[in-house]
């Protein structure tokens, strides 16, 4: 497990002052995707913004080819700088890009899923832990029922199974998420945080063949149909986009 790192960077001078009294015209868009997105041919509406424009992409992945991605474009809100804490070993994997700018219709850079890395990339060489878990990710409990979940062979040191639920947040744009996937026995709870985005997950890890088949709407473990979990660890994962102090005119993307 890596040691959490904290960054605080301050942008001085005019970058902190969102200059100009005239309102900017910015693209406005909010949508949740369950696969790759492409906005290159989409005509986006506009909105008048007093301070600046922003565009944010936030993605959560099981690590086994199931993902939920939020895309938001609109007015810049929140602080222009802020602290970040991250742990590269936290699971499940996530990624975020936050970009701010201060000219008309400048929030048009993040158009396709190419802005994100592959969060389900198999290790090379491809080694397996010998554990099999259910894997799913969706925005409704029925999206993650055992019947709709895939059985996956876990990678490398991921010898535990995880299940849980929570919310993905970009400002006041928020969606629920329900998830099952592989995890490490440590069931790392130290995710990442930032002032602009967050993914707040509650759940637990278990050990045993396909042990993560209980209801994803409950936090405490129920009766398992296979081997009982070893000392389930109740956890809250804060897997927010690890963003370090962005000023308008900059963009940052980090994995967790």
UniProtKB/Swiss-Prot annotation:
A single cellular component GO annotation: plasma membrane
Lipidation (GPI-anchor amidated serine): 225
Main location: membrane
CDD domains named in the record: TFP_LU_ECD_LYPD5_rpt1, TFP_LU_ECD_LYPD5_rpt2
Residues covered by the UPAR/Ly6 domain: 133-212
Taxonomic superkingdom: Eukaryota
Residue stretch(es) of the prosequence: 226-256
Position of the signal peptide: 1-25
Keyword entries, A-Z: Cell membrane, Glycoprotein, GPI-anchor, Lipoprotein, Membrane, Repeat, Signal
InterPro entries to which the protein is assigned, alphabetical: CD59_antigen_CS (IPR018363), LY6_UPA_recep-like (IPR016054), Snake_toxin-like_sf (IPR045860)
Topology in the lipid bilayer: Lipid-anchor; GPI-anchor
Glycosylation positions in this chain: 118, 172
Subcellular location per the Swiss-Prot or TrEMBL entry: Cell membrane
Protein name according to UniProt: Ly6/PLAUR domain-containing protein 5
């Amino acid at each position: 497990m890596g040691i959490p790192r904290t960054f605080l960077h301050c942008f001085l001078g005019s970058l902190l002052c969102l200059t100009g009294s005239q309102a900017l015209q910015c693209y406005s868009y909010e949508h949740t995707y369950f696969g790759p997105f492409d906005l290159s041919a989409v005509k986006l509406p506009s909105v008048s913004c007093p301070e600046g424009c922003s565009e944010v992409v936030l993605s959560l992945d099981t690590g086994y080819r199931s993902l939920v991605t939020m895309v938001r474009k609109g007015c810049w809100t929140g602080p222009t700088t802020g602290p970040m804490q991250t742990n590269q070993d936290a699971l499940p994997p996530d990624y975020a890009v936050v970009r701010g700018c201060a000219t008309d219709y400048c929030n048009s850079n993040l158009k396709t899923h190419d802005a994100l890395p592959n969060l389900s990339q198999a290790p090379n060489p491809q080694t397996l832990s010998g554990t099999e878990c259910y894997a799913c990710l969706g925005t409704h409990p029925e999206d993650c029922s055992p019947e709709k979940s895939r059985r996956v062979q876990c990678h490398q040191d991921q010898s535990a199974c995880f299940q849980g639920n929570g919310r993905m947040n970009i400002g006041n744009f928020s969606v629920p998420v329900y998830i099952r996937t592989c995890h490490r026995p440590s069931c790392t709870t130290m995710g990442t945080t930032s002032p602009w985005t967050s993914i707040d997950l509650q759940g637990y890890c278990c050990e045993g063949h396909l042990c993560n088949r209980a209801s994803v709407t409950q936090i405490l473990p129920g009766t398992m149909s296979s081997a009982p979990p070893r000392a389930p660890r109740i956890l809250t994962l804060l897997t927010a986009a690890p963003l370090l102090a962005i000023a308008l005119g900059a963009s940052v993307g980090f994995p967790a």
